[in-house]
């Protein structure tokens, strides 16, 4: 799956995946985006604790929490409560949608975007946004 929905978490070793790219919450509390086996982005929180988890909050903030539920990294995108999704896109970018509030900035131009689960993969940003808006309105 390439999407983390509001209220969902990634436990240590769990990840978003779209084939080539993996966005993983590692055992060492580092949240890392890999292109095949090469790390291309990270929260740089490795070694701060063990067995942290990632939470996509209903306020749009993506947060790494320690086992004691202390935040150790955040996307700083918190705002109004609503339905948000964190998407690992086909272009290698990880983006929080409600309105786009945060991204890793690692996209490769022209790669397209993966679709919402249960739908066919989409080839354009406009098509992806239609599906994201549908999710945000109906959830």
UniProtKB/Swiss-Prot annotation:
Question: Where in this chain does the record put each Bulb-type lectin domain?
Answer: 1-109
Q: Where does this protein chiefly localize?
A: secreted
What residues bind alpha-D-mannopyranose, as annotated?
A: 26, 28, 30, 34, 37-38, 41-42, 44, 57, 59, 61, 65, 72-73, 76, 83, 89, 91, 93, 97, 102
What this protein is reported to do is described as: Mannose-specific lectin. Displays antiviral activity and therefore may contribute to defense against infections. Shows agglutinating activity towards rabbit erythrocytes.
Q: Which organism is it from?
A: Narcissus tazetta
GO-annotated biological processes: defense response to virus; regulation of defense response to virus
* Subcellular locations according to the entry: Secreted
The protein's name? Mannose-specific lectin
Recall the GO molecular function terms of this protein's record.
Answer: D-mannose binding
Q: How does it assemble?
A: Homotetramer; antiparallel.
Asked whether the UniProt record includes Magnesium among its keywords, one would answer no
Keywords, alphabetical: Antiviral protein, Disulfide bond, Lectin, Mannose-binding, Plant defense, Secreted
Q: Which pairs are disulfide-linked?
A: 29-52
Record's miscellaneous remark: Has a significant inhibitory effect on SARS-CoV-2 in Vero E6 cells (IC(50)=0.8 ug/ml). Viral replication is fully inhibited at concentrations from 20 ug/ml to 5 ug/ml, and 50% inhibition occurs at about 0.4 ug/ml.
Q: Which tissue types show expression of this protein?
A: Detected in bulbs (at protein level).
The record's annotation in CDD domains points to: B_lectin (cd00028)
What's one GO-annotated cellular component?
Answer: extracellular region
Q: Which Gene3D superfamilies match?
A: Bulb-type lectin domain
């Amino acid at each position: 799956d390439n999407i983390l929905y509001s209220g969902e978490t990634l436990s240590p070793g769990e990840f978003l995946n779209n084939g080539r790219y993996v966005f993983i919450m590692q055992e060492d509390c580092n949240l890392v985006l890999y292109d095949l086996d090469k790390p291309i982005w990270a929260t740089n929180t490795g070694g701060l604790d063990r067995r942290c988890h990632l939470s996509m909050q209903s306020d749009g903030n993506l947060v790494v929490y320690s086992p004691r539920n202390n935040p150790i990294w955040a996307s700083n995108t918190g705002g109004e409560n609503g339905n948000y999704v964190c998407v690992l896109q086909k272009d290698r970018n990880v983006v929080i949608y409600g309105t786009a509030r945060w991204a890793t900035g690692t996209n490769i131009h022209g790669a397209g975007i993966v679709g919402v689960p249960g739908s066919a993969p989409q080839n354009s940003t406009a098509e992806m946004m239609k599906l994201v808006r549908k999710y945000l309105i109906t959830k």
